[in-house]
Amino acid sequence: LGVCYGMMGNNLPSHSEVIQLYKSRNIGRLRLYDPNHGALNALRGSNIEVILGLPNVDVKHIASGMEHARWWVQKNVKDFWPDVKIKYIAVGNEISPVTGTSSLTSFQVPALVNIYKAVGEAGLGNDIKVSTSVDMTLIGNSYPPSQGSFRNDVRWFTDPIVGFLRDTRAPLLVNIYPYFSYSGNPGQISLPYALFTAPNAVVQDGSRQYRNLFDAMLDSVYAAMERTGGGSVGIVVSESGWPSAGAFGATQDNAATYLRNLIQHAKEGSPRKPGPIETYIFAMFDENNKNPELEKHFGLFSPNKQPKYNLNFGVSERVWDISAETNSTASSLISEM
């Protein structure tokens, strides 16, 4: 499990304090949305695995020529390797023909290819996978999960991405938020189904039973990729979370329940793909410069580094008990069982 380190706040701790917090909480993975050198320098020697974002604003530039991709990889990857364990480069976040990022869609695959080539030229092709992070707006049919498919009007965009990932043996990064499905459709989707607390199967899909929406969403993307020749492509859940305030269903209790259950569930996998799911929780901190209001309330921590929830963040047989002291003493790490 990992946690996304967003920086859209004017009151957040220093980069070195943040990385120290990751280490003291035994959080072994981190997602960065852009190659912030302050954060990358703080990550040196930490052994934390990183999803490094190439931001949307740079995608067109990177697509326009190999020299730009080479420069970007040298400056933001090679200069920090191997002190920083960059595992994936996410070229763009939630670029989609059906959202406000549609102007970037034609540059997505050329940018992926250029960064992939530049990483290979840098001698890091076996160490770093190149992918992109997508959201569920690309999925047309998601019910039942086995019938998952990409929207027909985005296939021109998704098919080449899936083909690229298949050919380079990289996973697709997917942002999965049961919260938004639930809050947009509470009449059809029950809160327990969204929070992993439904006592029984809610959806019967052939021989597969679904007791939570997260699995149903995840498996619908697997099915969609299979339909487009990407049956061998894995998925990394690059964001998932629940807001604690700011909108319908966004409460401290709901967020705590979702996060606690997500952390546990990520070890188990989905009906279609059992086994641990590499998952990144959004986000490390409440970020007060984000909009709309609910976007300010996704943090596991307040900007003063105080935990908002009591969670067991089980990494390498350790428990993260944030009801314990919030400094970096060993007493906040209790061994599991």
Swiss-Prot record:
Catalytic activity: Hydrolysis of (1->3)-beta-D-glucosidic linkages in (1->3)-beta-D-glucans
Superkingdom assignment: Eukaryota
Organism: Solanum tuberosum
Regions that span the bilayer: none
Entry keyword set: Glycoprotein, Glycosidase, Hydrolase, Plant defense, Vacuole
Glycosylated residues (UniProt): N327
GO biological process terms, semicolon-separated: carbohydrate metabolic process; defense response
PANTHER family referenced in this protein's UniProt entry, alphabetically: GLUCAN ENDO-1,3-BETA-GLUCOSIDASE BG1-RELATED-RELATED
Active site per UniProt: E94, E239
GO cellular component: vacuole
Keyword Cell inner membrane (UniProt): no
Gene Ontology MF term list: glucan endo-1,3-beta-D-glucosidase activity
Protein name stated in the entry: Glucan endo-1,3-beta-glucosidase, basic isoform 1
Protein family membership: Belongs to the glycosyl hydrolase 17 family.
